[in-house]
């Protein structure tokens, strides 16, 4: 046995696992750290005082395993070194449709630290691989380049794509544009796939420098244009879990349709309180119910009852593990991938009308000025008195006699909710919460699951009433766990970064608008801006630019406040059926309640509460933020595909729209009635060279002076639709902006201006000559002044920097130019180009 083994803190573990143990991984890493230089295998063997062939072979295998796992690097000099000493970086590959890629360092957020991998470095790796790279001295567009050292963990998920057969060879083109390699499929692994089928494959061979990747078909999904296929592709492409594990199926098999009587014991009985649910017409899972009454001394008492999911989904159970994996429900236009099985999400947990349900209640008092005066949380049992919809509640509040008579016992309570909402809205405006009136759309499908129409979602006061009630409950819940210093997830939204903020301010200045607040504008400053743009034709577009300037809201164990809502603390409490962070918060609150009553059992409570650590919450924060982004990306991708499918029937139509985004390669137009975006490529514009002004968000023609600017009203013709690329191409028909120059080119205008300047100079010279002749006839009785002096005898100051009009012009970046009379050129672009 080595003399170094006793110094190994893990020597006992190694002795238990191996008859002839060698130093542990941890000890080898520490040894190399202290050595300060890379060492080859023989040097390590001697330095660690090992002996015999068995220990030599054991060391060889351990070093190879550590190299495989990225703990060590095998250098070109046949030595083992620590990755951090060689400035190597571990991270995940992010592919690009053009063939190159990036590595995002492990634990990094955002693309600022990404390392570029050139095309040749991506040949045998794909999007999602976990790799070790070494940054090089080269850089591209200000980003570091890297060299692939090793693949530490291959992407083990399946890939969705289109199956093709050409010249006797079968291959699959991945639907995910971030995977640029085609995958060869041997004949014995086609699994009956036919030309054009959408298939799911597994990669069996990563290939080499001279040979491409190979795979096998594991599932044939069907024809490319089959109804619902776009959703199936997105689910698999974005690795959204959609099948229930066997352990989950076993756990839910004994769940009934009614709440067990023993579960109601010890809870506050709210079954007589007229709580109601208010949701959309097509909602199937009901998380929340509300009731409001006027207080005698002024103000209101508000009950917000939320489905008690934590009673059924206990920590570390099969249901819980799958809920963590999913993170949230994913709502596609024609399908839902739930976080919980339907027996819970639409059954036992859903607050369906006229049935007993377990709930977590946040009971609050609201002052006449809209201030949250007090709150308390408790476990209860309830019975929803009605399943109302937003449209019904809105109609009741507007005086619909038939509905008011049908729901007569509830009308007065709904009116109190409305009265409280008005006060809450005023309080929200006063604290400076940022509120946008954006237009959302929904797809209307026919019996064949094809889109019949695209309609805007109308938000009425009923939507806003529920929104304010949920915000209040979330504030109260965040306040409770923060005051008790109980680990939980907060919903944080940080203030905008300096770079994005400056870009947004430059954009506003071009429109004659201003965002106050200096380097750190407050939510109130943004709210003031929102009031400035209210009613403008370009209001929606300015709001879009404002949103782009802000950071994304995330889940975090550390409370950093919510900038957009102008709140010091905020957490998600109101949707545990569809969001895992809410379920975590319920468990934390239950633990606090049980702890106060002396019912907790160490970290557990009898009804599903649990005390987590802050380290636990760090993990859950990253996981839940990731699954939320994953769901957003997947649903956005499906919506884009459906919009393209819908627009196929409108090719050749001329439609009204507004320029929604300007780039160096053209501008995107948002159709006024359909709210669909398409690209007017720079190559389709009138013959001219165009410059892109990123500050002014416009394209400027060099010769004719034509300007295409964000917010301009235009008419476009639908030129083409590409379903595979999810791309809609428009051609400009006319614009509301008057073209400049009346047909004169910039050269002609410059020549004319130069000619006029010369004539003016000649006239001034002739006038000066006449004055000089007159001056010589008059005796000089005043002393001659120095050229740099004024009448007062002081030195005359030159023009200030910036006085010249030309100095005020924003710098512009050269755009891609189109030669006169060239044909339209088909180009590919992704949504990233538009952001």
Swiss-Prot record:
Its main location: cytoplasm. Its EC number is 3.1.13.1. It comes from the Bacteria. Signal peptide: none annotated. Residues 739-835 are annotated as: Disordered. Residues 739-754, 783-793 have a biased composition (Basic and acidic residues). It is found in: Cytoplasm. InterPro entries: CSD, CSD2, NA-bd_OB-fold, RNase_B_OB_dom, RNase_II/R, RNase_II/R_CS, RNase_II/RNase_R, RNase_R. Gene3D superfamilies: Nucleic acid-binding proteins (2.40.50.140). This is Ribonuclease R. GO terms for cellular component: cytosol. One of its GO terms (molecular function) is RNA binding. It comes from Vibrio parahaemolyticus serotype O3:K6 (strain RIMD 2210633). Residues 267-593 form the RNB domain. HAMAP family: RNase_R. Residues 755-764, 809-829 have a biased composition (Basic residues). GO terms for biological process: mRNA catabolic process. Residues 765-777 have a biased composition (Low complexity). Residues 652-733 form the S1 motif domain. 3'-5' exoribonuclease that releases 5'-nucleoside monophosphates and is involved in maturation of structured RNAs. Keywords: Cytoplasm, Exonuclease, Hydrolase, Nuclease, RNA-binding. Belongs to the RNR ribonuclease family. RNase R subfamily. It catalyses: Exonucleolytic cleavage in the 3'- to 5'-direction to yield nucleoside 5'-phosphates.
């Amino acid at each position: 046995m080595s003399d170094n083994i006793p110094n190994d803190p893990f020597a006992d573990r190694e002795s238990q696992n191996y008859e002839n143990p060698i130093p542990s991984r941890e000890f080898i890493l520490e040894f190399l750290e202290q050595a300060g230089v890379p060492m080859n295998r023989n040097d390590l063997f001697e330095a660690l005082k090992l002996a015999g062939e068995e220990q030599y072979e054991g060391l060889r295998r351990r070093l190879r395993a550590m190299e495989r796992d990225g703990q060590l690097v095998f250098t070109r000099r046949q030595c083992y070194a620590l990755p951090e000493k060689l400035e190597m970086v571990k991270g995940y590959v992010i592919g690009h449709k053009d063939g190159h890629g990036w590595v995002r360092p492990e634990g990094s957020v955002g693309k600022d630290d990404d390392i570029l991998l050139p095309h040749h470095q991506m040949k045998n790796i794909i999007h999602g691989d976990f790799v070790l790279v070494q940054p090089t001295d080269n850089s591209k567009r200000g980003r570091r380049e890297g060299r692939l050292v090793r693949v530490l963990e291959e992407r083990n998920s399946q890939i969705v794509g289109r199956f093709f057969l050409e010249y006797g060879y079968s291959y699959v083109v991945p639907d995910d544009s971030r995977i640029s390699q085609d995958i060869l499929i041997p004949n014995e692994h086609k699994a009956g796939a036919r030309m054009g089928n959408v298939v799911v494959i597994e990669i069996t061979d990563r290939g080499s420098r001279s040979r491409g990747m190979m795979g096998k078909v594991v599932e044939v999904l069907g024809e490319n244009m089959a109804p619902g296929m776009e959703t199936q592709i997105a689910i698999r492409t974005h690795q959204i879990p959609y099948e229930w594990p066997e352990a989950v199926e076993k756990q839910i098999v004994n769940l009934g349709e009614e709440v067990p009587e023993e579960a109601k014991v010890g809870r506050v009985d709210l079954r007589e309180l007229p709580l109601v649910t208010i949701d959309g017409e097509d909602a199937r899972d009901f998380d929340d119910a509300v009731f409001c009454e006027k207080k005698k001394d002024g103000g209101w008492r508000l009950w917000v009852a939320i489905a008690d999911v934590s009673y059924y989904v206990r920590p570390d159970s099969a249901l819980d593990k799958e809920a963590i994996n999913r993170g949230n429900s994913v709502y596609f236009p024609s399908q839902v991938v739930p976080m919980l099985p339907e027996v819970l999400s639409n059954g036992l947990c859903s607050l369906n009308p006229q049935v007993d349900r377990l709930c977590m209640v946040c009971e609050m008092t609201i002052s006449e000025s809209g201030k949250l005066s007090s709150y308390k949380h408790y476990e209860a049992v309830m019975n929803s008195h009605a399943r109302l919809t937003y449209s019904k509640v809105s109609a009741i509040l507007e005086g619909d006699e038939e509905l008011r008579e049908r729901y007569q016992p509830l009308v007065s309570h709904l009116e109190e909710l409305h009265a409280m909402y008005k006060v809450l809205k005023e309080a929200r405006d006063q604290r400076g919460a940022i509120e946008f009136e954006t237009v959302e759309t929904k797809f209307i499908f026919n019996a064949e699951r094809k889109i019949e129409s695209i309609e805007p979602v109308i938000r009425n006061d009923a939507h806003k009433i529920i929104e304010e009630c949920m915000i209040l409950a979330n504030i109260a819940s965040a306040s409770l766990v923060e005051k008790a210093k109980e680990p939980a997830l907060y919903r944080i939204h940080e203030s905008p970064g300096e770079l994005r903020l400056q870009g947004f301010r430059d954009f506003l200045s071009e429109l004659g608008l201003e965002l106050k607040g200096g380097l750190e504008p407050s939510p109130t400053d943004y709210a003031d801006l929102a009031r400035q743009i209210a009613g403008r034709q370009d209001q929606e577009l300015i709001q879009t630019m404002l949103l782009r300037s802000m950071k994304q809201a995330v889940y975090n164990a550390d409370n950093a406040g919510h900038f957009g809502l102008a709140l010091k603390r905020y957490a998600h409490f109101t949707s545990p059926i569809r969001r895992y962070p809410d379920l975590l918060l319920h468990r934390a609150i239950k633990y606090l309640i049980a702890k106060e009553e002396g019912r907790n059992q160490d970290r557990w409570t009898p009804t599903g509460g649990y005390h987590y650590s802050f380290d636990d919450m760090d993990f859950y924060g990253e996981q839940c933020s990731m699954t939320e982004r994953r769901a957003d990306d997947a649903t956005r991708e499906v919506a884009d595909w459906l919009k393209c499918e819908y627009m196929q029937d409108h090719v050749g139509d001329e439609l009204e729209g507004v320029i929604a985004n300007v780039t160096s390669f053209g501008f995107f137009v948002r159709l006024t009635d359909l709210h669909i975006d398409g690209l007017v490529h720079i190559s389709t514009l009138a013959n001219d060279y165009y410059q892109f002004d990123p500050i002014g968000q416009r394209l400027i023609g060099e010769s004719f002076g034509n300007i295409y600017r964000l917010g301009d009203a235009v008419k476009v013709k639908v030129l083409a639709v590409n379903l595979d690329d999810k791309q809609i191409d428009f051609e400009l028909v006319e614009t509301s902006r008057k073209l400049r120059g009346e047909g004169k080119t910039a050269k002609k205008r410059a020549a004319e201006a130069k000619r006029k300047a010369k004539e003016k100079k000649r006239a001034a010279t002739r006038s000066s000559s006449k004055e000089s002749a007159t001056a010589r006839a008059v005796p000089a009785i005043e002393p001659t002044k120095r050229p740099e002096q004024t009448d007062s005898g002081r030195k005359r100051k030159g023009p200030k920097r910036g006085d010249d009009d030309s100095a005020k012009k924003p710098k512009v970046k050269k755009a891609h130019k189109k030669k006169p009379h060239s044909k339209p050129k088909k180009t590919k672009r992704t949504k990233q180009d538009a952001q």
